[in-house]
Amino acid sequence: MAKLRKGDNVIVIAGKDKGKQGTVLAVKNDRIKVEGINIVTKHQKPNAATGAEGGIVKQEAFLHISNVAIFNAQTQKADRITYQFDDEGNKKRVYRSNGEVVATA
């Protein structure tokens, strides 16, 4: 199970886009799509049924979730996530470095 969720602010820790930050657009299994990261060129075929035009399109591609880490805005560094239960018994995501609750999008 991925600890990162759609809307989280992450930083790339490995690969060609190392050091760049972005917002998570999608999480599928062990892959993640981040806004403005891992841009690839796709040669799109025209489709009359959907009205999509053909041509060369640049879009974000999925990258492995191990290549990104959540960005802690308080420490301005990459961080990890752990889970803790609050007083009511609700499960919360917290930063490992300082124990603050991760803001949900």
Curated annotation (Swiss-Prot):
Complexes and interactors: Part of the 50S ribosomal subunit.
HAMAP family tied to this protein: Ribosomal_uL24_B
A biological process term (GO) from this entry: translation
Molecular function terms, GO-annotated: rRNA binding; structural constituent of ribosome
Function of the protein: One of two assembly initiator proteins, it binds directly to the 5'-end of the 23S rRNA, where it nucleates assembly of the 50S subunit.
Lineage: Bacteria, Pseudomonadati, Pseudomonadota, Gammaproteobacteria, Moraxellales
PANTHER family noted in UniProt: MITOCHONDRIAL RIBOSOMAL PROTEIN L24 (PTHR12903)
Listed InterPro entries: KOW (IPR005824), Rib_uL2_dom2 (IPR014722), Ribosomal_uL24 (IPR003256), Ribosomal_uL24_CS (IPR005825), Ribosomal_uL24_KOW (IPR041988), Translation_prot_SH3-like_sf (IPR008991)
Pfam families, per database record: KOW, ribosomal_L24
Keyword set, alphabetical order: Ribonucleoprotein, Ribosomal protein, RNA-binding, rRNA-binding
Source superkingdom: Bacteria
One GO CC term, this protein: ribonucleoprotein complex
Protein family membership: Belongs to the universal ribosomal protein uL24 family.
Stated name of the protein: Large ribosomal subunit protein uL24
